[in-house]
Amino acid sequence: MFKATIDAYLLKDSIETLSVLVDEARFRISPEGVVVRAVDPANVAMVSFDLTPEAFDDFEANDCELGLDLSRINDILGVADRDDKVQMELDEESKKLKIQIGGFSYTISLLDPSTIRAEPRIPQLELPAEIVLNGKDLQKAVKAAEKISDHMLLGVEGESFFMEAEGDTDRVKLTMTRDQLIDIKPSQVRSLFSLDYLSDIIKPASKSNEISLHLGNDFPIKINFSIANGKGTIGYLLAPRIESD
C-alpha cells in the first residue's frame, strides 16, 4: 500500500536529483519514507536519496518497491504549476501508479524492479577534508571550468579550497578562503573529476544554500545536501579521474 500527497515542485526537484544520473530507479517505500540507491550506467557516480514522511502533506505506506521510469515522471510533473499538489496512489491489483496533478489524472505502468539495476553497495570512505559552501559557488566554478576543459581539479591548500581547470592553452582557478566558506575541515588533498558528471550533479545541488564536499587524494568525492526543506537528504559519490604524470 502506498498513498501520498506532496508539493509538485518539491517532488520535481527531488526527482531531478536522481534523473541527472539514471533513467530509471527502484523506490523502496516504507512507513519510514522513500529510499533510492542507484549507480549510473558507467559505474562512475552513485546517488543516495532519502525522503522522510514529513516531506509529504499526507503519507501512508506499507513496505513495497516501485520501479519508475524517471523521464516519464518528469514529463508528468512538467504540467504542474508552482502551487499544485501531486496525489499518488498505488493500485496493487493492476500494479499501476495513479497520479493526480493540476486537474490531470494519470495512470502509469510500473517497471518490474527486478529488471532495474540492483542497488549499489555504497563504500565507506575515510575522506580527510570537508568543505561546506553555497551550491551557487560550486556552480560558478563548474561553469567557468566548462569553457576551458572537460575535467576539474578540486583540492585544499592550507585553509583554502580551490577549484581549477586547465586546457591546452587556458587555465582557470577559483580559490575560496575559510571566511568565504561556510566551514572547512582542512587537509592537504586534491582529486580530478569529470566535468560531465559535475555539471549534471550541480544542477540540483546549486539550489542548496549549503552543500558538503568530502575529499581525499585521488579518491572519490562525496557531495551531500538537504532537499525538501530539510526533510530529505541527497548524497552523491563520484569517482576521480587519475591524473597522468
Curated annotation (Swiss-Prot):
Annotated TM spans: none
SUPFAM superfamilies in the record: DNA clamp
HAMAP family associated with the record: DNApol_clamp_arch
Listed NCBIfam families: PRK01115.1-5
PROSITE patterns documented for this protein: PCNA_1
Its job: Sliding clamp subunit that acts as a moving platform for DNA processing. Responsible for tethering the catalytic subunit of DNA polymerase and other proteins to DNA during high-speed replication.
Oligomeric and partner information: Homotrimer. The subunits circularize to form a toroid; DNA passes through its center. Replication factor C (RFC) is required to load the toroid on the DNA.
rRNA-binding listed as a keyword: no
Family label: Belongs to the PCNA family.
Lineage summary: Archaea, Methanobacteriati, Methanobacteriota, Stenosarchaea group, Methanomicrobia
Entry keywords, A to Z: DNA replication, DNA-binding
GO biological process, one term: leading strand elongation
One matching Pfam family: PCNA_N
Name the record gives this protein: DNA polymerase sliding clamp
Organism, scientific name: Methanococcoides burtonii (strain DSM 6242 / NBRC 107633 / OCM 468 / ACE-M)
GO MF terms held by the record: DNA binding; DNA polymerase processivity factor activity
